[in-house]
């Protein structure tokens, strides 16, 4: 029987960043994973929640979906250009002139103070970690559509992959955790959950529309999601709580920026994975949270 390269459970857990057992304990049982099928059959592909967490079909807070409308992402304070509307143009201009800790104009001033946690090397660590959190600035491809480098089943002359929903969810969860995700979930896309998508991207202001098209599209003014898209895949990336607690110092920025950068890269990996299986996968075009409500 042909097998792919083997990997012990302990090694696989290390790759996922989940290995916390001692070497002695780890040697008690070391099953191996020969391929993705075996990973899918393992607990790695399961969504285990604490006993006090209960999954329900509807949110515990009642939502009047008939009244709910899609919101323009550019009108949130998560989007810097909207700051002026929240704090006033005069205050916004004053803050821009002095350069805050998070603005490039303030980097030099903060570093010159040479305070612990705000020194030059702290800033450098933060900037390095945050490099790819805005993929549209650096990627040669459109992040919404993905790299589109993986060969499709059609190009390979083979049928696209098809499986049962439960099998598919385990496969996607296993793949995403291997790529670096901490938790993975799926949400069905229907007339109600579509309202959670912004009408316009929070950062570049492109209109986000659903349309009867066969493939996703992107123009200079729009991002088009096919109506036949039925599922949203969501995932999280771990951050270090101790570093986050140091906000607004660079250590916190580095932790958050690294997670957002990793999130963009993980999304690209998922896009290529699903493309190779024969499916379209659209991702947020900019920093996580620019396409739909999140949190």
Segments and roles (model prediction):
Residues 11-34:
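N-terminal export signals
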Residues 162, 173-174, 179-295:
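Catalytic cores of enzyme domains
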Residues 35-45:
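Ser/Thr/Pro/Gly-rich low-complexity linker/stalk segments immediately outside membranes or between
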Residues 43-67, 267:
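Extended, low-polarity segments enriched in aliphatic/aromatic residues
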């Amino acid at each position: 029987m042909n097998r792919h390269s083997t990997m012990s459970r302990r090694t696989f857990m290390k790759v996922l960043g989940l290995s916390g057992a001692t070497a002695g304990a780890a040697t008690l049982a070391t099953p191996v994973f020969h391929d993705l099928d075996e990973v899918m059959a393992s607990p790695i592909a399961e969504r285990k929640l604490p006993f006090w967490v209960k999954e329900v079909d509807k949110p515990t807070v009642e939502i009047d979906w008939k009244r709910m409308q899609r919101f323009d992402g550019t009108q949130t304070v998560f989007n810097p250009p909207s700051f002026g509307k929240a704090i006033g143009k005069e205050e916004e201009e004053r803050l821009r002139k002095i350069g805050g800790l998070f603005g490039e104009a303030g980097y030099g001033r903060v570093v010159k103070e040479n305070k612990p946690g705000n020194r030059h090397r702290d800033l450098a660590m933060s900037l390095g970690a945050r490099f790819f959190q805005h993929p549209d600035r650096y990627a040669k491809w459109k992040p919404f559509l993905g790299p589109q480098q993986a060969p499709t089943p059609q190009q390979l002359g083979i049928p696209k992959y098809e499986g049962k929903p439960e099998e598919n969810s385990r496969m996607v969860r296993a793949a995403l955790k291997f790529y670096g995700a901490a938790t993975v979930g799926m949400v069905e896309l229907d007339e109600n959950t579509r309202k959670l998508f912004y009408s316009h991207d929070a950062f570049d202001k492109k209109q986000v529309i659903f349309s009867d098209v066969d493939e996703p599209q992107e123009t200079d003014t729009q991002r088009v999601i096919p109506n036949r898209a039925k599922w949203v895949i969501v995932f999280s990336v771990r951050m270090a709580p101790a570093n986050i607690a140091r906000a607004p110092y660079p250590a916190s920025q580095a932790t958050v920026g690294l997670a957002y950068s990793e999130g963009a890269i993980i999304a690209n990996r998922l896009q290529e994975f699903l493309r190779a299986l024969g499916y379209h996968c659209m991702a947020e075009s900019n920093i996580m949270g620019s396409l739909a409500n999140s949190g």
